[in-house]
Amino acid sequence: MNDPFARMETRGPQGAANPMDSSRSLGDLGPFPREVGRGAPLAPGARNPATAGASRSQGGGHEDRTADRALGPRAGEELDRESWVREKVLFLLHPERWLGTRGDPAREEVAGAEDLPHAGGEDHGEEPNYPSVFQRQKRISGRRVAPPRDAADPPKYVLVRVEDYQVTQEVLQTSWAKGRMTTRTEEHFVTALTFRSSREGQPGERWGPAESRALQARTGASRVHAAGRRVSPSPGTWLEEIKL
């Protein structure tokens, strides 16, 4: 009677669960509820919104790539070259703007917060002189734009000469592993930019090579506003007319 193994043997068959009975009892409870967060089944002709969004995003990227391919690399190179010429001339004419020198009110902007609100009540209308937490700072804006020119002054132009050429040089290279000296050729592409101020001219006129040489002999340029391509006297060399 007190044998634990006997109690286990007598209670085991009664307490054991029949797998057929458990499945039958689960079947009586009905079907399981649908998982939370999963929507209703899609109709036979309906599209899955997740796949539709993915295809739409892929289609937009394809259209962007097609538009970039239509522009071509040449258009991007032209824009980069013209902007580079414009920025270079600005630096040569007004280095103080690029170096951050103060003194030009048209180029400086005030950045920072104003003084904090003053507390009142005991000063009888007088505002206490509290120091500002955020000190005012002056900075030079990133975009270099010439100050507005007086309408009475006639427009002036400066002629910029841009020349692309290739430099080839031989470099002696020593190979320590094999104990011999070899020659290696290096090629460098150089862009030379020179500019001279020109006489007062009319915008849109074309100059010949003789006139361009005469214009390059003058000096005294001031501000730069815009650039436009004019004459290409030789391959790899062109002239940029800069409006002052």
Swiss-Prot record:
This one is known as: Uncharacterized protein C6orf141
Disordered: where is this region? 1-79, 100-130, 219-244
Q: Which InterPro entries match?
A: C6orf141
Q: Composition bias, kind Basic and acidic residues: at what positions?
A: 1-10, 100-127
Q: Which gene encodes it?
A: C6orf141
Q: Which domain of life is it from?
A: Eukaryota
